């Protein structure tokens, strides 16, 4: 259902009250600078061209998805970040192996939940952590998958153990480990964070994913996830209309995310990180939508 409810002031006054346990303590980039915009990009094999596009949009931070994690890419990426003045806020990790983004195959293919790909993905996240360390990227971020709602499910316990292994590895590299929201309900995500029990865990709060997967209204989810939020994906979407497929992503301001109240809530939480625009289409329309989102979000952040 759409984002409705009590007035913004009374709703946000309760943010963060209901979460027990400690929020992440390991320092990252967040907290040093004012609320600012970012863009998630796929770097590909040409870091200079990819980061040049971010700079041409007059955006100063980026979450980076890398196809290549070889050491030979460290130098070119660092040079491109410095040349274009882009602050990297997270390295986004997916795979290896097939990932299917729907309700039937998703639980079998996404993240650290599936047994068949778990070992390879643990190793891949560790490689990504090493790569991020050499590039000066403060966080590693991934979808952990359809974490079971039932904490007595053996898959839940196995997934927690796997997350603990990669989060501990990131901690040794001086990084935060971030869960990308989407496949799990907010209370399941908080349970997993607390059961993993390491202080460098955080959440990349993807506003649309909570809606696309039918898991929560993001405004309500902030009450649980607020203390853990280290990154934001500014994205919009519609609720699912059939039980097989995710809801539809739409341009920011055209979906069910209540951005004015979300930004107000982030300010109340004293969130000091990046609000990272994500638009999962390609071509000229993607650039148009990113520019429109930037204008819209700048107006909200500045008020």
Describe these PLM feature segments:
Residues 26-46:
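Boundary/entry segment of secreted carbohydrate-active catalytic domains
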Residues 8, 45-48, 102-202, 287:
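Active-site acidic/histidine proton-transfer and metal-coordination neighborhood
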Residues 35-41, 62-64, 88-93, 140-142, ...:
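Hydrophobic faces of well-ordered beta-strands that scaffold small-molecule active sites
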Residues 1-23:
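N-terminal export signals
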Residues 29-32, 51-57, 71-96, 127-136, ...:
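Acidic (Asp/Glu)-rich catalytic clusters
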């Amino acid at each position: 259902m759409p984002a409705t409810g009590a007035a913004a002031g009374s709703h946000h006054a309760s943010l963060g009250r209901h979460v027990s346990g400690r929020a992440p303590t390991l320092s990252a980039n967040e907290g040093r600078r004012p609320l600012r915009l970012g863009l998630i990009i796929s770097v590909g094999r040409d870091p200079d061209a990819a980061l040049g596009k971010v700079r041409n949009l007059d955006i100063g931070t980026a979450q980076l998805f890398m196809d290549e994690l070889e050491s030979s890419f460290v130098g070119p990426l660092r040079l491109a970040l410095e040349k274009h003045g882009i602050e990297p806020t997270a390295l986004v990790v997916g795979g290896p192996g097939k990932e299917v983004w729907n309700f039937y195959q998703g639980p079998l293919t996404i993240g650290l939940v599936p047994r068949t790909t778990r070992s390879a993905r643990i190793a891949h996240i560790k490689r990504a952590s090493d790569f991020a360390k050499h590039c000066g990227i403060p966080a590693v971020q991934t979808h952990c998958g359809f974490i079971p709602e039932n904490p007595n499910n053996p898959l839940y316990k196995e997934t927690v153990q796997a997350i603990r292994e990669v989060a501990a590895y990131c901690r040794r590299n001086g990084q935060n480990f971030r869960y990308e929201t989407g496949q799990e309900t907010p209370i399941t995500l908080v349970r997993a964070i607390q059961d993993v029990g390491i202080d460098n865990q955080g959440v990349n709060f993807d506003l649309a994913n909570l809606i696309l997967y039918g898991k929560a209204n993001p405004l309500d989810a902030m009450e649980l996830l607020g203390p853990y939020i280290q990154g934001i994906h500014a994205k919009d979407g519609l609720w699912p209309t059939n039980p097989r497929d995710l809801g539809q992503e739409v341009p920011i301001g055209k979906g069910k995310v209540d951005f004015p109240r979300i930004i107000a809530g982030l300010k109340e939480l004293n969130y000091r990180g990046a609000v990272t625009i994500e638009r999962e289409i390609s071509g000229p329309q993607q650039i148009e939508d990113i520019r429109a989102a930037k204008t819209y979000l700048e107006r909200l952040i500045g008020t």
